[in-house]
């Protein structure tokens, strides 16, 4: 209970709210953790505190920790493990902590799907499922769905007198295909599976259309739409009231005030009717009559004010007219007839969905596979049982889990869906006031609605729970942000206090939701947040919508390139926490965030032109890559050589090497028939002399093709790909092209994709090609293989979704003028979790169709949910910045947009009016109106404070707001004055004078000689191993260098190499084991086997490497005198990296350069131990000794000493430089024979 919570220790770094989240218990707890508030650290600390609690310690395997991703789960385990190891240092004798470390790998810290899998594996016998099931591939799943659905529809078409089915087909299919019907069935199936009881949800959907005996007031759609009617009437009234204020100005059209007041009265009557019933509004709408505006002499009044008054009145009339046309042009009973007419058709549709679900589940069961939704529903099936009234109650298994788990902790709770919520509910206590559920998340960062995440679950508890936890659950707000500067936080708060509210946005951005400063930064220059609004040029706007989009991307890319280059070149400084100091910004400090990636290729191209290194993980382009395209055509030809286009592509490719003339020659031998038939015929005849080379190329390819076709019928697809790569030499060929490594990586991915395909229930080349086509149809192009590390010094481009959880010193958020994606609202049918199904009413006999009440309601609901989701996406984007936030958007007509945005200045409340926020079509429609109410926009607007309250106008935030002329970004670089004369002479094709001021400069540059030419023959950076080799006579000779040059640079992929580990790979594996041996545990076979298995799980070793480890040799080392010294040492450091400067003449025996030259030397010391009398350096060796030297180790010892003397001397020199302490002993340990060699100077 509350009074038993531990007090926060003195000097603790935890805030009061963080500490409360760490120690609070005794009820369900919801932690609303704002961006950068340290929620993961809090979660880990809470777990640790529970594990090491002195009075009531909890075993780690009695906690269920649910994370959003596998990576998050692994990070959580690692953090807990590190924290426990720190505890163990203070309490080395604690058996409880040691036990927790051993339990950690088996602990239930995982994604919800992994937990579901664990439950299913344990209780599979309660389900009709093969215990050896596998997880289905997404594309395989899609192909199976198609197969099942085709069979069902085929059966339905074959049934006589299937009247309702054919009615359904007539309404929802075109003359060409029934694709729309198939999409409806699949969409309803998918949506239903997002609910704990799919059949119940489908039945409710049908029940909603059974309106027998009901009035329109009984329909949920009408109730919801009435709220929207009130909203739109309120908007219209605000327009009229604003017009009235303007008309009453000294130079306003005062005679029109009387008419405007009558308008307000009319709108008031309509609003009153909307508060009563649908029928009341319908009747009131039939009597709407607007008075005619009084005529005035316009010259007597301010013309602009008159125009504004007229414009506002017209906007109000348009709002009412829209309502009349959409909702109240038909009698209420006609809407009811629509539902009644559609009811049997919808009933048939739902029946088909149920049949499909049943058949699809059966097919997956037969193939021994499940998908991710199956995992959730199977788990729920095990954990629940249905009562007589259809309610789901916890099963006996659920009670077992309730007894097992002391607490259930859920990370990223805002992204939970209904099914997952039910699973969690069944393994936790029933009562919130005495519950054991701990939830962490930030509903403002819930951006996965498209994955069926339900932020309403979080919001419901946040509203229901109290900060004291009295009578129910407790909520805790973590609002302090430890990531960002004040300027970023204040700028974000200023925008969201104005745009995010409960009616529009689903969340109140109140004092509890505001971001509060928790990080400390040194004073910085130019840290103000920025809004840069680019005005497109007239030429760009005229270019059409698609052309304008291209230009927008180019304009924004150029502006960002200029800013990045300027910041890097000027030495703009950012704070480095590791060194606790400011440092010059690097390219890796920048990120460009986009809502989606279509602009990314253009932005990358523009940045590259400016010499800026850039990377974007594009999910497209893989199948467009030339090498992949050619190989896919090869496989198409193997499958069916009668396809002319793929065959011609292969013949024209480097594999065969024909040119256009060769193809024309081949076609001339047979104008009819396929290319393959012509080629076969050509090869049967005797070629002309000039066709001999063509004949040889085609014969070579034809013979290979026949072999591949035969091979494809008998062997696996992956083996076929291997064979094609090898026999054509194409893999090696692309390796020699520009970006060869990338191209080879793409071909390896194709091989891997084939192996993945073969792990599915499908087989054969034809199905594989269909498999790939299905991927492309879905728009799931994979993106080219990754050939860049995370730590590369590049500017990154990513989606806002990908950036969630990350942070960057400088953030550009671009594309803010792009319209929101509302395509889902335009579909022929709409689905919603609460409102079910909505589509147009279609009468195929009368050939009419019109909007239905359900469609209007769902569309409106989805629009408001989309607006709320986009607000949360913007919040995520703005909170990624640590030090500098730059917002960029492009508009067609800045003056016109500014006029619209300036409406916001007339409002005195913090939260902008609903109609402004709900009417936004892009992010700029929220950002600009907000900033136009701040003093920092005055340099742009020059309008003064006006009626804006001081607390808004003078809010403590710094912004730079600027409109950028697109012409300045597209203008070419200005030509230097001194070059102008030469350029003009060249344009006019005149002779350029031979004598020039630049003649000597040009001559000097052409004849310039590098002052350190001797040094160019040597590397500026060497590893210790390379220096050692230079000192060995054979390695240092010219012949050895030539041998190295002859070694192939491009390596073959793993699957094309000989099996087995190389000596180097074996050595690497042994060194890895020696690095990770736990010196605190007894060195036994069992302990080492467990450790090696753990290294395999953590991907520190491969299975093959693990099998090669000779455990007895590792034990032999620790049994030796040297090994015992390691175990007894004061301190032991392993795998110690170092870098030092070394005189070049020490590294190179044949150095010819200047004596003062130095090079950079890098190396890694295997082991160093500190004993009472000094430091000993140990280097482990896996050289083969036994059987290689006839005289045994005595013969080998001087050779080995000579081989490794330089290496260990350099290691010792590096240690002595860094530690300022002499190395007393340098030892080589050889595992082969358990030999120790001491290296003397």
Swiss-Prot record:
Function: The heterodimer acts as both an ATP-dependent DNA helicase and an ATP-dependent, dual-direction single-stranded exonuclease. Recognizes the chi site generating a DNA molecule suitable for the initiation of homologous recombination. The AddA nuclease domain is required for chi fragment generation; this subunit has the helicase and 3' -> 5' nuclease activities.
Protein name listed in UniProt: ATP-dependent helicase/nuclease subunit A
NCBIfam families linked: addA_Gpos (TIGR02785)
Gene: addA
GO CC annotations on file: cytosol; DNA helicase complex
A GO term, aspect molecular function: 3'-5' DNA helicase activity
Assembly: Heterodimer of AddA and AddB/RexB.
UniProt record similarity statement: Belongs to the helicase family. AddA subfamily.
The EC number(s) this enzyme carries: 3.1.-.-, 5.6.2.4
Catalyzed chemical reaction(s): Couples ATP hydrolysis with the unwinding of duplex DNA by translocating in the 3'-5' direction; ATP + H2O = ADP + phosphate + H(+)
Cofactor: Mg(2+)
Keywords per UniProt: ATP-binding, DNA damage, DNA repair, DNA-binding, Exonuclease, Helicase, Hydrolase, Isomerase, Nuclease, Nucleotide-binding
A GO biological-process term: double-strand break repair via homologous recombination
Gene3D superfamilies from the UniProt entry: 3.90.320.10, 6.10.250.2380, P-loop containing nucleotide triphosphate hydrolases
Domain UvrD-like helicase ATP-binding: residue ranges: 12-485
Pfam families: PDDEXK_1, UvrD-helicase, UvrD_C
Sites where the protein binds ATP: 33-40
Naturally occurring in which organism (per UniProt): Bacillus cereus (strain G9842)
Residue ranges annotated for the UvrD-like helicase C-terminal domain, each copy included: 505-805
Keyword field contains Transcription regulation: no
Parts forming coiled coils: none
């Amino acid at each position: 209970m509350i009074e038993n919570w531990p007090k926060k220790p003195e000097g603790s770094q935890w805030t009061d709210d963080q500490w409360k989240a760490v120690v609070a218990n005794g009820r369900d707890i919801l932690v609303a953790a704002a961006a950068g508030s340290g929620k993961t650290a809090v979660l880990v600390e809470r777990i640790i505190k529970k594990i090491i609690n002195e009075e009531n310690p909890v075993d780690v395997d009695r906690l269920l920790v649910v994370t959003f991703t596998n990576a998050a789960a692994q990070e959580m385990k690692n953090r807990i493990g590190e924290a426990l190891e720190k505890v163990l240092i203070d309490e080395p004798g604690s058996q409880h902590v040691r036990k927790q470390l051993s339990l950690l790998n088996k602990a239930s810290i995982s994604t919800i799907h992994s937990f579901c899998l664990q439950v299913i594996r344990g209780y599979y016998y309660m389900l009709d499922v093969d215990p050896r099931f596998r997880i289905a591939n997404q594309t395989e799943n899609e192909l199976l769905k198609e197969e099942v659905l085709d069979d069902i529809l085929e059966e339905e078409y074959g049934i006589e007198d299937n009247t309702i089915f054919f009615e359904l087909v007539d309404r929802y299919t075109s003359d060409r295909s029934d694709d729309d019907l198939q999409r409806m069935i699949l969409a309803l199936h998918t949506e239903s599976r997002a609910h704990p009881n799919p059949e119940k949800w489908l039945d409710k959907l049908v029940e909603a259309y059974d309106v027998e005996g009901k009035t329109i007031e009984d329909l949920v759609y009408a109730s919801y739409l009435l709220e929207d009617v009130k909203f739109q009437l309120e908007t219209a009234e605000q327009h009229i009231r604003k017009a009235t204020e303007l008309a009453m100005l000294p130079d306003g059209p005062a005679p029109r005030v009387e008419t405007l007041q009558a308008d307000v009265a009319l709108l008031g009557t309509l609003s009153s009717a909307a508060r009563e019933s649908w029928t009341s509004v319908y009747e009131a709408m039939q009597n709407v009559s607007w008075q005619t505006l009084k005529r005035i002499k316009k010259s007597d009044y301010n013309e602009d004010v008159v125009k504004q008054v007229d414009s506002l009145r017209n906007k109000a009339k348009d709002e009412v007219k829209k309502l009349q046309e959409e909702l109240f042009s038909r009698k209420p009973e006609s809407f009811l007839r629509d539902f009644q007419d559609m009811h049997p058709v919808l009933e048939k549709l739902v029946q088909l969905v149920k049949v499909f679900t049943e058949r699809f589940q059966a097919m997956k069961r037969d193939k021994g596979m499940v998908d991710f939704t199956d995992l959730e529903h199977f788990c729920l099936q095990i954990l629940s049982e249905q009562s007589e009234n259809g309610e789901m109650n916890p099963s006996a298994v659920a009670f077992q889990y309730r007894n097992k788990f002391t607490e259930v902790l859920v990370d990223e709770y805002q992204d939970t869906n209904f099914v997952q919520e039910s699973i969690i509910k069944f393994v936790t206590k029933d009562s919130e006031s005495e519950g054991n559920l701990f939830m962490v998340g930030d509903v403002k960062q819930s951006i996965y609605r498209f994955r069926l995440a339900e932020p309403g679950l979080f919001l419901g508890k946040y509203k229901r729970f109290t900060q004291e936890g009295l009578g129910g659950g407790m909520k805790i707000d973590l609002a302090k942000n430890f990531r960002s500067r004040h300027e970023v936080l204040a700028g974000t708060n200023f925008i969201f206090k104005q745009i995010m509210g409960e009616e529009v946005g689903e969340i109140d951005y109140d004092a509890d939701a505001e971001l509060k400063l928790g990080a400390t930064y040194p004073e910085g220059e130019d840290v103000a947040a920025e809004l840069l609004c680019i005005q497109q040029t007239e030429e760009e706007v005229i270019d059409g919508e698609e052309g304008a989009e291209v230009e927008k991307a180019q304009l924004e890319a150029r502006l960002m390139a200029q800013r990045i280059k300027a910041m890097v070149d000027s030495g703009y400084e950012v704070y480095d926490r590791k060194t606790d100091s400011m440092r010059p910004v690097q390219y890796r400090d920048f990120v460009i965030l986009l809502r989606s990636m279509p602009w990314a290729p253009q932005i990358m191209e523009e940045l590259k032109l400016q010499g800026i290194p850039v990377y974007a993980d594009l999910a497209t382009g893989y199948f467009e890559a030339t090498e992949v395209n050619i190989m896919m055509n090869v496989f198409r030809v193997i499958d069916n050589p009668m396809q002319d286009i793929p065959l011609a592509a292969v013949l024209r490719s480097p594999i065969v090497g024909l040119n256009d003339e060769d193809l024309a020659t081949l076609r001339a031998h047979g104008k009819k028939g396929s290319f393959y038939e012509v080629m076969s015929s050509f090869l049967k005849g005797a070629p002309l002399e000039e066709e001999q080379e063509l004949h040889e190329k085609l014969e070579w390819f034809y013979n290979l093709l026949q072999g591949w076709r035969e091979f494809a019928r008998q062997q696996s697809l992956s083996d076929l790909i291997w064979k094609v790569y090898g026999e054509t030499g194409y893999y090696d060929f692309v390796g020699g092209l520009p970006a060869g490594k990338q191209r080879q990586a793409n071909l390896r991915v194709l091989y891997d994709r084939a192996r993945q395909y073969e792990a599915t229930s499908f087989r054969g080349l034809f199905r594989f090609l269909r498999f790939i086509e299905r991927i492309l149809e879905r728009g799931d192009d994979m993106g080219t293989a990754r050939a860049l590390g995370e730590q590369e010094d590049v500017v990154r481009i990513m989606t806002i979704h990908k950036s969630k959880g990350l942070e960057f010193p400088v953030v550009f958020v671009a594309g803010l003028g792009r319209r929101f994606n509302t395509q889902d609202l335009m579909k022929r049918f709409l689905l919603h979790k609460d409102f079910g199904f909505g589509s147009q009413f279609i009468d195929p006999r009368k050939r009419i169709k019109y909007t239905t009440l359900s469609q209007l309601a769902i569309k409106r609901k989805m629009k408001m949910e989309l607006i709320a989701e986009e607000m949360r996406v913007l919040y995520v984007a703005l909170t990624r910045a640590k030090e500098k936030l730059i917002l960029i958007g492009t508009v067609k007509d800045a003056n016109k947009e500014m006029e619209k945005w300036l409406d916001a200045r007339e409002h005195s409340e913090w939260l902008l009016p609903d109609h402004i926020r709900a009417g936004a079509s892009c992010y700029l429609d929220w950002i600009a109106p907000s900033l136009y109410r701040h003093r920092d926009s005055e340099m742009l607007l020059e309008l003064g404070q006006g009626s804006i309250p001081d607390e808004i106008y003078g809010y403590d935030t710094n912004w730079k707001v600027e409109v950028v002329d697109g012409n300045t970004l597209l203008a070419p670089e200005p030509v230097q004055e001194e070059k102008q004369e030469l350029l003009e002479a060249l344009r006019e094709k005149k002779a350029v004078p031979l004598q020039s001021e630049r003649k000597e400069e040009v001559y000097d540059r052409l004849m310039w000689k590098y002052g350190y030419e001797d040094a160019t023959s040597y590397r500026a950076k060497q590893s210790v191993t390379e220096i050692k080799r230079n000192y060995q006579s054979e390695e240092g000779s010219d012949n050895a260098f030539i041998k190295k040059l002859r070694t192939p640079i491009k390596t073959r992929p793993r699957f094309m190499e000989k099996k087995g580990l190389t000596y180097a790979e074996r050595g690497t594996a042994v060194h890895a084991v020696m690095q990770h041996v736990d010196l605190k545990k007894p060195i036994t076979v069992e302990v080492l086997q467990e450790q090696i298995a753990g290294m395999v799980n953590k991907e520190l070793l491969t299975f093959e490497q693990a099998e090669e480890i000779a455990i007895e040799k590792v034990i032999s080392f620790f049994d030796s005198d040297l090994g015992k010294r390691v175990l007894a040492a004061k301190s032991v450091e392993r795998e110690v990296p170092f870098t030092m400067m070394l005189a070049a003449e020490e590294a190179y025996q044949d150095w010819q350069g200047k004596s003062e030259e130095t090079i950079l030397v890098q190396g890694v010391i295997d082991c160093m131990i500190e004993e009472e009398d000094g430091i000993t350096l140990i280097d482990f060796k896996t050289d083969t000794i036994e059987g290689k030297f006839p005289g045994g180790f005595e013969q080998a010892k001087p050779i080995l000493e000579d081989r490794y003397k330089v290496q260990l001397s350099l290691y010792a020199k590096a240690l002595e430089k860094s530690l300022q302490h002499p190395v007393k002993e340098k030892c080589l340990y050889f595992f082969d024979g358990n030999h120790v060699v001491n290296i003397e100077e």
